[in-house]
């Protein structure tokens, strides 16, 4: 089955999506939509497909089966709903949108229209992260007790000042937590389960933006485990994401995309990591050089379309991270 894809958005992430689609047999980018003529025309020249500057004629492009949203986060639900009403399957970049209210509206419309909805959390497809979930699920470290998750990244001032939407409440929904930290929020929920209690503080410590560039949250999981989450874009020069999970029988440490340590009460004889290098230097740059994670997420979504199954991260799964981010933001306003 030939899957023809339309891309919404003219930025770096839409280029990532286009490169990822090119690597999938039977998939083709046939149309691009963006409000910046220079950017969307560049994507069209670089990757093929018709360029549109208006959403309505883009969605009417007759040879599409699905769209991938790479637009500002706060536009996802509105654009996704419009696509679903045209019978198009919708795969959106993270987060699904900037509020659970908008997420719910998008989920409901896709269900009403009978189209698939997915959210791109590419970490779920990376080998060591999948293995982390498997090992913890199998009880390798016993009952999880403590989690320390650190997203201490750096973005220069131009990252915000050169964009009309980054670091804004209206279109980014927040700052370092909902944009950069949301991948790790999703990872924690996927691996360890629901969070039932939150205490938090957020602040703009370095950047002159209306939302936070730093967030700290204390999490209580339904399992009884306790966690500390840090997310910042103010930690020069930027450090790899690090997640340490300690259980009754030992500790597993993930650094960026790789397991770097498995320390157990009883000697562990298996491999520590199954990969040699991280896929992308996210700690210092938003540009995705290695598209394997995105390609796997898009392939999974196409498989769901072709076989009428659910993608690994469907709309309801994607909503979970936004719900926890909202809870952290609410907790940060309490004294």
Locate the predicted segments by residue.
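Hydrophobic residues in well-ordered beta-strands that form the structural core
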Residues: 53, 91-92, 117-119, 229, ...
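Basic phosphate/pyrophosphate-binding loop/patch that engages nucleotide-derived ligands
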Residues: 108-116, 130-146, 246-247, 251
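Beta-strand-loop-alpha-helix segment that lines the small-molecule cofactor/substrate pocket
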Residues: 61, 66-73, 77-124, 139
């Amino acid at each position: 089955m030939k899957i023809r894809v339309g891309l919404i958005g003219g930025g770096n992430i839409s280029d990532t999506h286009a490169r990822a689609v090119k690597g999938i047999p039977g998939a083709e980018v046939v149309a691009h939509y963006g409000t910046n003529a220079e950017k969307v025309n560049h994507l069209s020249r670089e990757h093929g497909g018709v360029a549109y500057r208006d959403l309505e004629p883009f969605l009417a492009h007759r040879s599409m089966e699905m769209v991938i949203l790479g637009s500002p986060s706060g536009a996802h639900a509105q654009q996704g709903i419009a696509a679903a009403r045209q019978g198009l399957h919708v795969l959106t970049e993270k987060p699904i949108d900037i509020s659970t209210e908008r997420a719910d509206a998008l989920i409901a419309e896709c269900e009403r229209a009978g189209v698939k909805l997915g959210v791109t959390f590419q970490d779920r497809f990376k080998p060591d992260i999948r293995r982390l979930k498997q090992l913890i699920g199998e009880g390798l470290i016993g009952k999880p007790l403590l989690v320390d998750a650190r997203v201490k990244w750096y973005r220069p001032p131009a990252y915000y000042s050169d964009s009309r939407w980054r670091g804004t409440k209206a279109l980014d929904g927040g700052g370092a937590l909902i944009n950069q930290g949301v991948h790790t929020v999703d990872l924690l929920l996927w691996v360890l389960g629901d969070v039932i209690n939150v205490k938090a503080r957020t602040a703009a410590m370095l950047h002159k933006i209306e939302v936070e560039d730093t967030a700290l949250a204390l999490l209580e999981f339904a399992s009884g485990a306790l966690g500390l989450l840090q997310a910042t874009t103010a930690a020069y020069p930027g450090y790899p994401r690090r997640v340490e999970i300690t259980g009754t029988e030992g500790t597993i440490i993930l650094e960026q995309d790789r397991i770097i340590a498995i320390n157990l009460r009883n000697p562990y004889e298996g491999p520590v990591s199954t990969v040699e290098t991280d896929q992308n230097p996210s700690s210092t740059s938003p540009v995705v050089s290695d598209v394997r994670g995105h390609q796997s997420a898009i392939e999974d979504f196409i498989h769901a379309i072709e076989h009428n199954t659910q993608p690994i991260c469907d709309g309801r799964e994607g909503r979970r991270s936004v719900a926890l981010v909202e809870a952290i933001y609410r907790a940060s306003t309490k004294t």
